[in-house]
Amino acid sequence: MRIGLISDTHDRLPTINAALTLFQQLDIDTLLHPGDIIAPFAAKPLAAFPGTVYVTYGNNDGERLGLSKVLPQIKDGPLHVELGGKRILLHHFRDWCRTADVALADIIVTGHTHEVTIERVEDKLFVNPGECCGWVTGRCTVAILDLDAEHVEVLEIPA
C-alpha cells in the first residue's frame, strides 16, 4: 500500500492543487497531512480529494472552527492510524510526540520544520515530507510512503 504525505501547505493553493493532482495520477487514495493548512479556503481541495485524508492541526492553524467545518476529520495530534498493517502516528511537530505514543507506532509522520527528514531510529521510521508551500526552503515537496517496504520517495512540486 502506498500513501501520500503532504505537510505545511500554508494556503498556497497552486502547490496544494498540483500535489493533489500528482497523488491522483499516481493512484494514491490515502493522504496524511500533519498540519499547517492555515485557512479554511486552503482546506477545500483536501476535502475534495477523492480518497481518505487524515489530518492534524499544526501550530499555525488558528482558525480551527473554520478548518473543522471544511475538514470534519481534522484532529489535535497525536493521531494514531493503522494502514496496511502498519501503526502510524501523525503529529505536527516531532518534538511534541510523547514517548508512549511513539512506542505504539511503526511509522511517525510529522511536519513543522519544513525540512524533508527520513530517519530510522531503532525499529521506528520517522518521516517529514517537507513543505508543500515552498515558502521557507524554496522547495515544494510531498512524499509517497510505501508501507510494505517502509520506503519513502520525496517528490518536488513545481512552484
Question: What is each of the regions a protein language model found here?
Answer:
Residues 78-119:
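Internal catalytic-core helix/loop-beta-alpha segment
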